[in-house]
Every structure is written in structure tokens, then in C-alpha cells.
Amino acid sequence: MSGSRPTQSSEGSRRSRHSARIIAQTTVDAKLHADFEESGSSFDYSTSVRVTGPVVENQPPRSDKVTTTYLHHIQKGKLIQPFGCLLALDEKTFKVIAYSENASELLTMASHAVPSVGEHPVLGIGTDIRSLFTAPSASALQKALGFGDVSLLNPILVHCRTSAKPFYAIIHRVTGSIIIDFEPVKPYEVPMTAAGALQSYKLAAKAITRLQSLPSGSMERLCDTMVQEVFELTGYDRVMAYKFHEDDHGEVVSEVTKPGLEPYLGLHYPATDIPQAARFLFMKNKVRMIVDCNAKHARVLQDEKLSFDLTLCGSTLRAPHSCHLQYMANMDSIASLVMAVVVNEEDGEGDAPDATTQPQKRKRLWGLVVCHNTTPRFVPFPLRYACEFLAQVFAIHVNKEVELDNQMVEKNILRTQTLLCDMLMRDAPLGIVSQSPNIMDLVKCDGAALLYKDKIWKLGTTPSEFHLQEIASWLCEYHMDSTGLSTDSLHDAGFPRALSLGDSVCGMAAVRISSKDMIFWFRSHTAGEVRWGGAKHDPDDRDDARRMHPRSSFKAFLEVVKTRSLPWKDYEMDAIHSLQLILRNAFKDSETTDVNTKVIYSKLNDLKIDGIQELEAVTSEMVRLIETATVPILAVDSDGLVNGWNTKIAELTGLSVDEAIGKHFLTLVEDSSVEIVKRMLENALEGTEEQNVQFEIKTHLSRADAGPISLVVNACASRDLHENVVGVCFVAHDLTGQKTVMDKFTRIEGDYKAIIQNPNPLIPPIFGTDEFGWCTEWNPAMSKLTGLKREEVIDKMLLGEVFGTQKSCCRLKNQEAFVNLGIVLNNAVTSQDPEKVSFAFFTRGGKYVECLLCVSKKLDREGVVTGVFCFLQLASHELQQALHVQRLAERTAVKRLKALAYIKRQIRNPLSGIMFTRKMIEGTELGPEQRRILQTSALCQKQLSKILDDSDLESIIEGCLDLEMKEFTLNEVLTASTSQVMMKSNGKSVRITNETGEEVMSDTLYGDSIRLQQVLADFMLMAVNFTPSGGQLTVSASLRKDQLGRSVHLANLEIRLTHTGAGIPEFLLNQMFGTEEDVSEEGLSLMVSRKLVKLMNGDVQYLRQAGKSSFIITAELAAANK
């Protein structure tokens, strides 16, 4: 299908389009910034935004002086906000290499209340920072500056030597230097005496608990809760949650304000209102505060001898730019606090962790939590740090909601497939418009129409019959060879009468079911979906559209999207395309329909029989696994009567299966656990499945003297075929041994060292921290598990140094795991009950450990919290053995990869020699034919180099490969591809002919020519291999250009490789299409080539005819404009 955007695209091409859009948007941002700086007070916001227009995704990025100057201005600004001061130090000598002009006044001025002794220190270039502060403060700074990740210790409380005034020192590293922001501790503020994340987390404990307790399934509820908690935590006049949409425009999705302020809920604003450069900085600095937009900024003076410009991007004091200050002033906002919400990209990640190279998920800026105040407002760094952590917790929940949305998309696809099958049973095609459900139920739309045998059937909001006929004629004239069109703007797609359709019809998806018959789906303009909850203005109160103001932004956004609808999703186009194929191939006449219907019912019945047999086999296997499992598993029916009791639970309790079956479960648990189990049963029977619930179960007969068994259980609702809950299954962990150890901790009243240092193998791995987050305990079992001795971790920050995502003793899998560990530790300090969660980390030796973490607070004799204890419960021996086998397989794969890397490296050396020799030859006098041959050789060398760079075959297969776009001609590609099979074809006397027209061969295209060359060479070689001696291979190509908008042309390329003989074996073609698990080398080569073609929004077909067969390769490229 053709369209204003590709209807089917891989993850790699989606990322490429997104990257190109960001680059293009940055250019637009730069121009707006330059216009603002040049125009001053005469800057016309609305006109400027309208002139820039929407960013075109397929437009090649450009780099110009305006953009470069803009980015340098953003990154290398030399101004800070005056509420604090800044020093930059040489990393080796701790001497000042830059300082803000207000630093001397804040850090060295004597206080009248504090008598000064000795000379006052002088602040300037070359000053040793330690001379400015008291001895304990200087010592603390020196210790922190020698720390690996200095940000872990922020903030550091220091006192000035002359005035004894307290400051928070906030440190970060940049290339070649250390930047320290000094923020004064306000008189009303209780100074934070201990550094580290755990201290700041306490400030947000209530808000975190509230977020954690929210049920999933509502992004709106999550955002509303977040802004309410931030509103209460920070005290700002207005708190908003911004969400960035796919096209980078923003929307206020939640808001809380103090009475009397105009609400901005529902506001949409153009992408330019928050420039891409600012978004990049938000990804780096996740919290940004502006204290007073009217304050005069302080300059930063740097040593003139420095060979580089200092960047203040990481500084908490960095001054906002004038354009943003003007925007705030127009909103009557004096102060702001912004928190970035950074989430994972929506791509897959392998479940099996790698000990050496664990790939991190790509991150993206989902949105912002923005606080505004009508008066100057300062938030101390500890509270800002707590807000940052709260934003990270919020981001984790946003991730989960996005994943749930993706699951809903999958359900929609399944629903669509059901609808398609339902339509398949009808009298096509009229049944798809005359019955229910109909084609409007297939995808979200405002209207749909069927043009069939020169008659029109309409549903919902559609153009008139006259306009529908005009659209059909336009498609036949301008998109004659395409099977359909999808666009979010008929105006931009080039339909002449698009504006006459009005706002009700902007976007369209259309497909052909025959040469004259079509189906249409229509969407109204985006603004129709937008509702701003802002206050209505008085008719006489008119906004100045030239000012940057929310209402102006909203109007500018509506101006940009006034001819656009919501874009068509890929899965929606898949559903439309599926319906198109069904109608084109399955319903040629009513007789065929009847036959097909009978065949379908027959197939469905066969599937039911197969499904029952398969279900019986699966059920038998599941029963066997449950019976032999090494963990306790039990089940009850809807009345609470036991109907499942495996060998392990019988062994632990001393109650046999026969004795347990039929008993009410509540009679088998300890009295103290009855209410817990009763609540869990009720919730599970209502469909709410709880996890990590701890209770005690009675023991019987020979086990009775051992006392009750302590279990931590996950509940799973059992459902029948109609999804009704008919029982509950419990999968448990036995925590009896661990509970015994913890009870001993309580009984010995703090004298726990005998247990901590006891090498008894029955004692689980234990570690602990003090109340400030420094590691204070690390028992022998923990040392054995991690490979880290006690002295290596004691007195290190548990969060960041011991467990972290970067340079830590025990590396965690990702940032989400790090945040969750912080939540658990924080909750353990503030709550009554111990926390139990799943936990995983990499040991020093690279082993990935998965376990259950139990955290409980440590109390002194007076009941004061002095830290936390953490216990690990490891997986069973059988599970560890299975993981060990998996790791062995992974190591074998790594060895093979190393061998492959060695071969690739050895190939590169002679390849470099060949390329050098070619360049030497290019410098000599050559004729036209010699130069053509040399160019073909160069293209082949580039192809080989590109293949050697392909380190991850799985990424190619999954479609996660970025294409390298550039201009080329088909003549270059076909010549280089053909040259690679000439040796083989000459050896078999196979003649290769090219029947492509000269115009197509010489047309300039835009795409990844080397990948296209690689694909064609592979298919040509396969064709030659299966062509008999003396046979022929014919190459032909056609090119169709579709106009997308006013300046972009889409080039639909089709190449046919026709060869004589019986053709490619069927099993190889199955391997190419991925329908067989065992793939040969030839099959893998075909499959990879097809995946590369699909990255170009194309595909490969194989057509068999009498005495000959053809590869038909299609690809979507851009037609380069000269």
C-alpha cells in the first residue's frame, strides 16, 4: 500500500524516522530561537510557528550554521541562577578553574555573628577549594571528590570557613573537570547531615506508598495521583503532567491548581514549545528548578588558559534561556520545578541476562511533571532529590501502563481477526456494510464507505457520493498501480478538493478489492479529538497571538493540525489489509462463497478436535509437573475445599494427599493466619491475584513437633472455558528456616553478631545498612554468594556502590531494579511489616542470581530504627541446575561468537589492503570502462565491510537494524550485484541479461544502496545455483513514483529475477519465510535477505511458472530531488 507514511514498518525503520524527525525538529527549534533573539519584543509567536509547519519525517536532515549556533548556545551557556553559586575544579589538583561572579560574596564574606580568626580566604582562579571551608567540610569534600560516582553522595553539607554558613554542595563530573553547585541551607530548614539517596527517599515515602498501592489499568488515575502528591509535597500553585505524543507535540493530561488559577487541563501545544535540545537535557538532568524568572543571572568566569569551554548542562543552577523566561512571564509564572518522566522504548528485550554485556533498553522522554508558582519559590536539594526519585517510581508505573496498553492492542488484533472471520462467513462484500459488526468496527474511524459495482454504501460521517467518486477517480489517476492509500491528511496527500470536505473528513484509508471496487475509512481532524478545559475568555478580553502563552500555543497547535486526523496505526492497517486480501481472493462469486464457508466450518471443527486432544496432553503434563515440583503447590475450589495437594506440601506438613483432599483450607492454616488466607481467597475468587503473601500452615503426625510451616505464596485464579473463576492455585516458598533465624534476631535483643558471622550453611545470605544507607553487615553466606569479601563492601553506599547499574560491586539489571530496591529499603524503615520482593543481581563473577529478598528494620533497645537487615532466599537446587545448563549454552554461543569475531577481524586486514590498492589505482590515468569496473569493485568492498559490521544477526531478523540512507542509481546497484555472481554463472554457462529500461537504471533514488545490493546479489546467486547449465537469468526492474504531499515522492521499486529450470526447492522457500525451525545456511541467507527487504518496507515473493521461476522483490525508496 502507498500512503503518506509507511503502513508497515519495522522497529528499526520506526527509530530511523523518529531520529530524522528529531533532527528536523531541532532545525525548526533553532530557527525559532534565532528569530526570537533577533526580533526581541517584536517576535510574533503564532506566525513563526505556522511558518515552520509540521515536520516531514522523510525529509533528509540538514546541518546549518543556525542549528550549530543554537546547540552551542544551549550547551555552553555561561550564566547561572543567583540563588546559589558555582565552582569548577581541576580534577587532579582541586584548584578552581572557573567560578560564578557571586561565589566570593556567598562563600568568603565574614558573618558579623561569627568572629573570624586569621586571614580571609580569597576566591579566584587557582584557589584550593579546601581553603574556603572548615576542616571537617574540606575533609568531606576531598573524600567525595575521590569517589567513583560523586553524584551518589549528593548533597554534601559543608560550612564556610569565614561565616560558618551551611551550604549543600552538589557535585557532578564533566570532561576534564568537576562542577560543584553550592546552595545555601535556609534558616527554616533542618540540614540533612547524611548524604545519599536513602535519606532523600524518606521525604517522598508517603507519595511513593500511594503510587505503589494504585491498581493498574488507568493511566489517567496514575497521572492524577502523581500530580496531587507532588502538589502536596512541593507546595507549588500549579502542578501538571505533560505527555509527549508520537509527533512530539505535547498535551496536559492531568493538573492540580490552587483556587483562582486558569486551568490548562487538555491543552495541546506544538512540538516547538519544548525544543528537542531541552528534552535532551531533561534526559540528563531529570529535575530542573527555576527559582525566580525575574532574577538577574550571575556570569561564570573561567580560566582563560583552558583549552575547552565548560558545559553547565549538568548544573542545578544553570540559567534558563531568554525565550523560556518570556514564556513563563506571559503565563504569570515566576518559579517552576520540572521532573522528567523517562521510560523504556517500546521494543523487546531478551529475558535471559548476560553476565558480560547486558543490553540496556533504549530510553525516551514520555513526558514531564511541571510545577509553576506565581511568586519566587525555592525547593531545597534534598526535596528535589526526593521528587526525582518519585518521578522514577512514576515512570516505572507509566511503563507498566504502556505495556498494558500494548496488551490491549494485541487483544484488539485478536478481536479484529474474529471480526474478519465473521465477515468471511457472510455474503461478501455487501455483508460488511449491511450487517453488524461492519467495517466501521474493524478500526477506529468516523465513517466508512464501500464502492461496489458503481454503487456506494455509506456508514457514519463520510464525504458525499460526488466527492467519493472524485476520490476514487483521483486514486485511479495518481495511484493507479497501488493497492490502496493511507494518510492522515488528504490535503497533504495531494487530493485537490480536500479543503472542500471540511473538518469532518481529513484522514483516509482506502483499499482496492478489484480494479473498480474500493473500501474507504475516514477520520475527522485532530482538533475534533482535542478538548481544552481552559477557562472561557470574556468576548472583549482578547489574547495577543504574538505572545508565547498557553492559549497561543493551543491555537498554534490547532493551526498546524487543522487538516490532519489521528494517524493510522500499523496494526489497524494490518487489519484493513487482511480484509482486503480476504475480499480479493476469497469471494469471487456466491458459489465460491458457499464452498469456502463449508471448508471454513470443516477446518474449525478439525481445529476443535485437535485442540481438545492437545488440551488433554497439556493437562496431563501440567498435573505431572505439579505433582513432582520441588516447591509447595496446592489448590482449592470455589468453596475453599482443597482439590490439589502436591508431594512437597505433603512432605512439609505431614498431611498426605488423601487426607488433605476435601478439607476446607482455612482449617489447615494457623489461627493467626486465618484472616490473611480468607482475604486472599476472597480476592482471588473475584479475580484479584495477590503475590508474596505470607502465612503459616499447621503440621501433622510426625511433623507436628516441628511447629507450623511458614510459606510465602502467590495466588493464581483457575478459570473455566468461559473465563469464570472456579478455584485458586497457590505456588509457595518455604520460609520456615529464614523465619527461625529472624526470630533468633529478636530474642537475642541486638546481639546478632554470632548469627551474622556464623558460617553455618543453614544461615541464608544476610546484609544490612545503617539508617543512612551505608553497608554495615555482610555475612559469610553473602560473601560466598557474591564473591565479595566483607571488608570490600562495609562502609560503602548500599544503593549505588554495592548494588547499582553502573560501576557497582553487584550490578543490577536496569534502572527499574535500582529504583525498586530503593523503595523496598525505604518502606522497610517506615513500615511495620517486613518487605518481601523478588530480587536479582550479577555477582562479581558475572553469575546472575535470582532470589527472594526479605527486608526488615533494625531497632536498638529504645525502639529507634538504626538500619535494615536484608535476607536472601535462593532458588531450589533443581532450578539452579536448569539455570546452569542455560548458562553453559550461552557460554558455548559466546565462544562461537568469539571465533566468528576472530575470522571477521582477519578478513578486515586484507580487505583494508584491497581498498588501499584501489585508491592507489584511482589516482592513475584510467579510461571510462576502467573507472566503471573500479567503481563496481568499490561497491562490493563496501558491501563486504557492511556485512562484517553486522555483529548481531538476531537484530536483523527482528528488524532492529538502522538503514544508511544516501543517493544512488539502480545502475550502480545492479552492476555491483551482477558482478558477484558472474564467476558462478560463467562456470555453469548461465547467461545473465538485463531488460531494465535506461530511464529506470539512471533515475536517482534515496535509500540504503549497499543493503539493496547485498540482497540482490544473494537472490541472484541462489537463482544461478538452481538454474541448469546453459540456462538463463533475466533481470528486470520497474519504478513507480507516488506523490506524498507537495515535496516528497515515494519510489516503489519492483525487481524481477527470472531464471529457467525447476526453481528453488520448497523447503528453502519455507526457511526464507520463517515457517521452519531448522534453518540451513542457504535458508538463513534467504531469510536475512528477506528481512532486509522488509526493513525497506518491501517484501519478497517467489513465482513458479512453466519452465521458469521468478524472485519478485519490492521496496519503498525515496525519489531524490535534484
UniProtKB/Swiss-Prot annotation:
It is found in: Cytoplasm; Nucleus, Nucleoplasm; Nucleus speckle. Keywords: Chromophore, Cytoplasm, Kinase, Nucleus, Phosphoprotein, Photoreceptor protein, Receptor, Repeat, Sensory transduction, Transcription, Transcription regulation, Transferase. Changing residue 727 to E: In HY8-3; no regulatory activity. Residues 218-402 form the GAF domain. InterPro entries: GAF, GAF-like_dom_sf, HATPase_C_sf, His_kinase_dom, HisK_dim/P_dom, PAS, PAS-like_dom_sf, PAS_2. GO terms for biological process: detection of visible light; gravitropism; negative regulation of translation; photomorphogenesis; phototropism; red light signaling pathway; regulation of DNA-templated transcription; response to arsenic-containing substance. It holds the Pfam family PAS_2. The keyword Transcription regulation applies. Expressed in fruits, flowers, leaves, stems, seedlings and roots. SMART domains: GAF, HATPase_c, HisKA, PAS. NCBIfam families: sensory_box. This is Phytochrome A. The lineage of its organism: Eukaryota, Viridiplantae, Streptophyta, Embryophyta, Tracheophyta. The gene is PHYA.
